[in-house]
Amino acid sequence: MKNKTWLIVAFVFAAVMLLAAVLYPKLTEKYSAGSTPDNTNSDTVIQADDFTVYDSEMNGVNLSDYFGKPIIINFWASWCGPCKSELPAFNNLYEKYKDDVVFLMINLTDGQRDTVSSIKKFVSNNGYSFPVYYDLEYDASDTYGVYSIPETVFIHADGSLYDIRVGAMNEAVLENYIKRMIGGEEK
């Protein structure tokens, strides 16, 4: 009886593994490098909600101040490993596309793990040239319901939402988003 039970368990396990091996490539292809999700209805337009963050001089800055160009908002923190892993890609693409796209690199400044002075030092030490904005009052992160970082919000030049992506992105995926946004291509 034990041998029969063991044989059934082994057969079920083998069947599950075979099914997983067959389905895995299909289920993950939409997340491969260079791809962007195609899960929104292009007939539905959702306007991006406005918020206020602070620049390096502690001047209040509104999202709506930047409508007119495509906008990429990245919510991040210096203690977040996945955030730190994607910052070099953001910096490279900021240098390449800064005339065509607005980059709002928004630090979730909690006053403890991340302070304005510690983030200025972090950015300087890493040689990043992108502008950093500080979400001191959590207006931006609350507005967009940020509960997990990194989170990146893509906004069309007219102020309508293009996409929201949670999790770190590699440079190829991020650049694909940028090219689609500045090329006027709809998802």
State each model region's role:
Residues 1-48, 187:
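N-terminal targeting signals for export/organelle localization
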Residues 50-71, 95:
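A short beta-strand-turn-helix
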Residues 67, 75-92:
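Conserved redox-active cysteine motifs that mediate thiol-disulfide chemistry
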Residues 69, 87-107, 124, 171, ...:
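Conserved helix-turn-beta segment immediately C-terminal to the redox Cys motif
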Residues 72-73, 103, 152:
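Hydrophobic beta-strand anchors of alpha/beta hydrolase catalytic cores
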Residues 101-114, 129-137:
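Thiol-based oxidoreductase modules, predominantly thioredoxin-like and allied folds used
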Residues 120-157:
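Short, internal strand/loop/helix patches
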Residues 154-187:
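Thiol-/selenol-based redox modules, centered on thioredoxin-like
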